Each structure stands twice: as structure tokens, then as C-alpha cells.
């Protein structure tokens, strides 16, 4: 029998995913991490980006704006501020959010305004990247 792990993705809105998986990929603060069953314990902050949950030939993709990844030997838990299934992301809205954040950065008058605009820009860019990666994966598998 194949070894798998329990994966739970939870946001303030509720549980988005709960199930068994063979591998999880997430955007940690220091770069992408790949988690396999029996991984050493880990607690790390997540930055805006894609989370992929792989089980056999199936792959579920999510966007999170920030959160925490906790890894136990047989359980991976992602606690996200906001989590959205990648297929539910709206590219036009993400592009508009990116444009607004860029405008806000140009018009920022304080360090706080700049920091807020940078966060908004990072989230919008991460959403666009998640959409692009999902589209590319679907195209490669002939599902687009």
C-alpha cells in the first residue's frame, strides 16, 4: 500500500481541502517547499502563492495570500488567511488589482502606504502566476 499523508487546508472562511495526498508543494517565506509523507516536522510562514496537493495522477491547486504550514510525519496543515481554489481565481480581477497596487505605489506618500501597496502587488502577481501555472498544466494534459 502506498504511503500518503493527511492534508488540511483551512482559511478564515472554513475548510477548503481535507484528504490524503502523496505530496504537497507550497510557497514558504524562503522559497518553495515540497513535502512528502514522513517529512521531518516543520513550521514555516507561507507567502502569497500556489499550493499544490498531489495524489496519484490528481492535482489540486490553491492560491493562498499568506499563512502557516505545519508538517507532522503524517499530517500537513495549512492555515491560511485567505485560500481560493485556483480554478476559481479571476484573471481580470487579479490584473486590475495589480494595476491598482502599482498605481498606489506610485502615489504612496509614506512608508506604510508603500508597504501596503507592495503587499497588494505581491498578492496580485502571485494570483496571476497561479492562474498561469494552472492554465499551463491543463494545456499540457489536454484539459484546457
UniProtKB/Swiss-Prot annotation:
SUPFAM superfamilies hit by this protein: Epsilon subunit of F1F0-ATP synthase C-terminal domain, Epsilon subunit of F1F0-ATP synthase N-terminal domain
Major subcellular site: membrane
UniProt keyword annotations, A-Z: ATP synthesis, Cell inner membrane, Cell membrane, CF(1), Hydrogen ion transport, Ion transport, Membrane, Transport
Membrane-topology annotation of the record: Peripheral membrane protein
CDD domains named in the record: F1-ATPase_delta
GO terms for cellular component: plasma membrane; proton-transporting ATP synthase complex
Coiled coil: none
Entry's localization field: Cell inner membrane
Domain of life: Bacteria
Gene Ontology molecular functions: ATP binding; proton-transporting ATP synthase activity, rotational mechanism
Keyword Cell membrane listed: yes
Function text: Produces ATP from ADP in the presence of a proton gradient across the membrane.
Record-linked PANTHER family: ATP SYNTHASE DELTA/EPSILON CHAIN, ATP SYNTHASE EPSILON CHAIN, CHLOROPLASTIC
Subunit and partners: F-type ATPases have 2 components, CF(1) - the catalytic core - and CF(0) - the membrane proton channel. CF(1) has five subunits: alpha(3), beta(3), gamma(1), delta(1), epsilon(1). CF(0) has three main subunits: a, b and c.
Family: Belongs to the ATPase epsilon chain family.
Protein name: ATP synthase epsilon chain
Organism encoding this protein: Hydrogenovibrio crunogenus (strain DSM 25203 / XCL-2)
Lineage start: Bacteria, Pseudomonadati, Pseudomonadota, Gammaproteobacteria, Thiotrichales
This protein's encoding gene: atpC
